[in-house]
Design a protein with these regions (language model features):
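Short gly/ser-rich loop at a beta-strand->alpha-helix junction or flexible surface loop bordering the NTP-binding
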Residues: 1-186, 305-347
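Surface segments flanking catalytic/ligand-binding clefts of nucleic-acid enzymes
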Residues: 2-4, 25-30, 165-166, 170-347
């Protein structure tokens, strides 16, 4: 290849064929752009002398993680939300609620701060670093605890733990002793408190918010999360987001997808089925204040306890049912079982 020809980038990793690794300038033009090409419109600078072809999509979250990860020196790794995303955490989008991009945290020393990255020079055992699909990242426990410690609020920290568990990256009973073993780190009190509120079976961040409104704002006993409900003949009726077994009250968060005509019809049919079994429901939608939702939950629970509806439902699972409420249960599934049993979950 001549020095005047832009090299054709190979895919970064067999499992990441859609990604392109940043390249250093190469005077020969074989392994990267020549100095002249790098200054032209066909290459984009990613930082510290690295470049990718200009057609590479910088908004793709995994590409952004890769570009920032290329800045690592010979030690350390990507951590926090970016590591969790790279390890398979589908809910870690790298975008704030206002649509702006979160910086990628790099657990290393001897790296200058710049736009797009947050250097973290905390003590790091080399055993806590792994290479996953060609990129050095901190292991899931470390990455989860990091993001929980630096989360903007306690509720955000709970969401981190729950969504890491959603993707079966961490077991909550391992997260607690891990946090205890790192008591001197910034943000550990918040992380420890968040673990106490966390659950392995939440299916979306907004479900977590509704559960925290239920327990923290309304001050009610903690509901079960995504627990299947059956009639007394063992037929599966539905799996509500939240379920107060004592009161016979369930909670659901309805996002935008629930406004679709067919989806809304299915929701109404299921609500009717729950009602006929003696369950009362509370629905939360986007834009409601915490106090509004909490008041409605309290009122529904009080009404249900007063009415003492007949219990034509149960959470006792029939022998044929395969439980998926815990990370351990989901990890034990075959790929075919995961595709079949977990298809209803979001992300």
């Amino acid at each position: 290849m001549s020095s005047g020809v832009t090299p054709i980038p190979r895919s970064f990793h067999p499992n990441r064929r859609h990604l392109v690794a940043p390249r250093l300038i190469d005077p020969s033009g074989r392994r990267g752009p020549t100095p002249g090409r790098a200054r032209g419109p066909t290459w984009r600078r990613t930082g510290y002398g690295f470049y990718v072809p200009s057609w590479v999509d910088a908004t793709l979250v995994e590409q952004r993680i890769l570009e920032m990860g290329a800045l690592l020196p010979g030690h350390g790794g990507v951590t926090g939300w970016a590591a969790l995303r790279w390890l398979g955490g589908s809910w870690f989008t790298g975008v704030r609620a206002d649509g702006t991009a979160l910086p990628v945290a790099l657990a290393t020393i001897d790296i200058r701060s710049r736009a797009g990255i947050v250097p973290c020079e905390e003590r790091l055992d080399p055993e806590e670093i792994t290479v996953h699909d060609g990129l050095r990242v901190t292991r899931a426990l470390r990455s989860t605890l990091f993001q929980m410690r630096y989360a903007d609020s306690l509720w955000d920290a709970v969401i981190v733990a729950d969504m890491a568990a959603f993707s079966d990256l961490v077991l909550l009973h391992e997260l607690w002793p891990y946090a205890l073993a790192h008591s001197g780190m910034t943000g550990i009190p918040q992380a420890r408190e968040a673990i106490g509120h966390s659950d392995e079976n939440a299916w979306s961040p907004m479900e977590v918010v509704m559960r925290l409104i239920w327990t923290c704002t309304a001050g009610l006993p903690r509901p079960l999360t995504n627990r299947p409900v059956f009639d007394l003949h063992g037929q599966h009726i539905g799996t509500p987001d939240l379920l107060d077994v004592e009161a016979g009250v369930y909670g659901e968060y309805d996002g935008a997808m629930h406004l679709d005509g067919k989806r809304r019809l299915r929701d109404l049919v299921r609500e009717d089925a729950f009602r006929r079994l003696g369950l009362e429901g509370v629905v939360m939608v986007a834009g409601e204040s915490r106090d509004e939702v909490a008041a409605r939950i309290v009122a529904t629970r009080e009404r249900a306890l007063r009415h003492d509806n007949p219990r034509l439902w149960t959470i006792d699972q029939p022998a044929w049912w395969i439980p998926t409420e815990t990370v351990a249960q989901r990890r034990a599934l075959s790929e075919a079982e995961r595709a079949r049993l977990l298809a209803r979950r979001s992300a």
